[in-house]
Amino acid sequence: MARNSSMGKTRSIENFEVRHTGNSEAVPFVKQHHYSGRCHGGAMCWSLIDTKHDELIGVAAFVTPISENVRRSLWEDNKKEELKHHVTELHRFVTLDDTPHNTETWFLSRALKGLKDYKPKYKAVISFADETFGHVGTIYQALNAIYYGKSGSAKYYKDEDGNMRSPREGGYNVSNAEAKERGWTIHKRESKHRYVFLLPDPYESKEDVFEDMCVESLEYPKA
């Protein structure tokens, strides 16, 4: 959800379009409206456009996970090396608050299809719902994503502007002492709920993709 919005406009899904866009508008939009205040500069972005008002009202940003272990962890042992390159992550997803009911599921389903069309190699898209901010993944559940449990708890920093900062910045581990020197405060991050969307090739089914995975499909968490 967005941190703020353009209230007062009447919007209709009939006027919405999903477009694969560059980062020059999409990334600043995410930084302004996503609760984290941050977005990877190299993300693959799909934008939600309100054509009636010629306005950007949402962004889905995908980034390949830096950690090879994260990408490998989805697959059975005999598939880990082959399929680790077929995983990406829904890095940021945000829409303005004044969009109609079901906008988020409508938008995300089309962004995922757009991603598969653009990069057919991707078979799995992982996404995390952050309990620290009260998220359980309701949108992902509505799109039948596979829920495969929680990550471990961790820490994060907040900078002087209130933006979240990762303990790993630009490939460099930031210690607690260094964070304090920068004026950052230390916070505990609760576990994240882990989901994966399956993107089968035309000759496959979702069941075919899931057969190569080692994760267990669990019951959805409730808010």
What are these regions (language model features)?
Residues 38-42, 187-190:
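A short catalytic or substrate-binding loop motif that flags glycine-/basic-rich loops and adjacent residues
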Residues 177, 181-212:
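Long, intrinsically disordered, low-complexity Ser/Thr/Pro-rich regulatory/activation regions
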Residues 44-46, 58, 88, 138, ...:
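Residue-level detector of short, conserved catalytic/binding motifs and their immediate flanks
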Residues 2-41:
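Short amphipathic alpha-helix that is part of the acyltransferase structural core
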Residues 15, 43-45, 122, 192-194:
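Extracellular structured ligand-interaction cores
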Residues 20, 63-185:
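Acyl-donor binding region in acyl/amide transferases
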Residues 207-223:
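Short, cationic low-complexity segments
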Residues 30, 43-64:
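Conserved beta-hairpin
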